[in-house]
Each structure stands twice: as structure tokens, then as C-alpha cells.
Regions:
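Flexible, low-complexity junctional segments that flank or bridge functional domains
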Residues: 1-96
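Conserved acidic, small-residue-rich alpha-beta core segments centered on
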Residues: 91, 96-98, 102-227
């Protein structure tokens, strides 16, 4: 790519938290593995396993749903998850339902449609107890789901403006290159869900993400909803 003059090493300059510059020579390590920051394990958004799931908070009497990609888990179909979630709502009668789309880059928006249809006529929608979290990593079909939840279920959007535009290309597919095995993703459809609108989906309540919160394992968005 022409970024470095040699493939053996590169000198990088970093700015630390004290606003001082630090230079370091980095060398490639084919065995290196990325590790999550220890504080990230404290965040509820990263605690659940799989693409989607629910966590019931007994103390707060709320259900937290994480939805990390708009795709089916072959071992755990979304229809099964939807049925289990609706059962939990019926049995627990939570005060709030939170659907986290902050780290969802898209896929197939129609997967969530049956859940949205089921929530539309429920008390969580009518009493404005449904919260949808959006942010800079909310793209494509996840953005469409957020808009549907807002329009059909009167969901309250919390977080940051989406990186993806309201009107955009989506329904992502992918294929693998034969020699490099690199995965290429591409969009197959254009969605104009808000005619004439230009730009991101803006939350009803904006709460900026910060490095300091991440380092402390703190989720200011969830803390705000807990206080409501």
C-alpha cells in the first residue's frame, strides 16, 4: 500500500493521555493476537455470547437486548430468540426494554421485522418504555431497524448520531477472494426511508461516548436509562 518503506519495521509516533508524544519502532509479529481492553469486559454490551441475546436485570427490572449483526445464528434462529424474549416480557413484565444497536454494522434488516411487529402493540411501546441505543458503529440494516423501532414502536433513541446515513445502500452480501481469502462485502439495495433527508439518524437523547468511560468500564448511555 506504500505506507512504509520497508516491511520489516515502522516508526510510529503516539500522543498519550498527558498530551506528550512517544515514538516507538514496531515490527511485524505473525503470531500476535488482539486482546480486548480489560475494562471492556465490564461493559454489558460485550458480556453476552453470540450475535444476539437478552439479559434480565432483576434489580432494575429491565431487559437488555444486544444485537451485534443483522444475521441469523444457524444454531440459534432469531425466531427462537424472539419467542424467548416475548416470553420473558410476559413473565417478568419489565419496566424497560433496551435494544442495543450501537455495535451493529448491518446485514439483513428483515430478520428483526417479526420482533418489531410483536412489540408494536405492546405496553412497552404504548408507555414509551422501549429504548434503542445507536452510535457511530450503527450502519445499514441496523439503522433501518432503529428507524422502524422509532416509527412503529415509539422507541426512544439514545446514544450518538449514526455513522451511516438514513438513506443509504444496504442488504450487505459478501464473498471470499480465491487467492488472498480476503472477505469482500458489498451492498445490493438502496433504501430511501426518509425522502429528502440527508445525513445520520440523530438520537432523541445524545450521550457522547468517551475514552475515559471506556477505560473505566462505564456505560453512560445505560446509566442514563437506569435513571429514567
Amino acid at each position: 500500500m506504500g505506507i512504509t518503506q520497508t516491511k520489516d519495521s515502522i516508526t510510529c509516533t503516539f500522543l498519550n493521555t498527558d498530551h506528550k508524544t512517544i515514538s516507538a519502532v514496531l515490527k511485524p509479529d505473525p503470531k500476535a493476537k488482539l486482546r480486548k481492553a480489560p475494562s471492556s469486559t465490564e461493559l454489558r454490551a460485550f458480556k453476552g455470547k453470540g450475535i444476539y441475546g437478552q439479559i434480565y436485570d432483576k434489580e432494575q427490572n429491565l431487559i437488555y437486548v444486544y444485537y451485534r449483526s443483522c444475521q441469523q445464528d444457524k444454531k440459534y434462529p432469531f425466531s427462537t430468540f424472539t419467542r424467548e424474549l416475548l416470553d420473558t416480557i410476559a413473565n417478568r413484565h419489565p419496566q424497560k426494554l433496551i435494544i442495543d444497536l450501537r455495535y451493529n454494522g448491518g446485514g439483513n434488516s428483515s430478520i428483526m421485522d417479526p420482533l418489531i411487529d410483536s412489540l408494536q402493540n405492546g405496553y412497552l411501546s404504548h408507555e414509551h418504555k422501549l429504548y434503542v441505543l445507536i452510535g457511530k458503529q450503527t450502519f445499514s440494516s441496523a439503522l433501518l431497524n432503529a428507524m422502524s423501532l422509532k416509527k412503529q414502536c415509539q422507541a426512544i433513541l439514545v446514544g450518538e448520531a449514526t455513522a451511516g446515513s438514513v438513506n443509504h445502500y444496504g442488504e450487505v452480501r459478501k464473498f471470499e477472494l480465491p487467492y488472498s481469502q480476503a472477505i469482500v462485502t458489498y451492498s445490493t439495495k438502496y433504501f430511501e426511508t426518509w425522502k429528502g433527508h440527508d445525513g445520520a439518524l440523530i438520537p432523541d437523547k445524545t450521550i457522547p461516548a468517551s475514552v475515559e468511560d471506556f477505560k473505566r468500564g462505564r456505560d453512560s448511555v445505560l446509566e442514563y436509562i437506569y435513571r429514567q
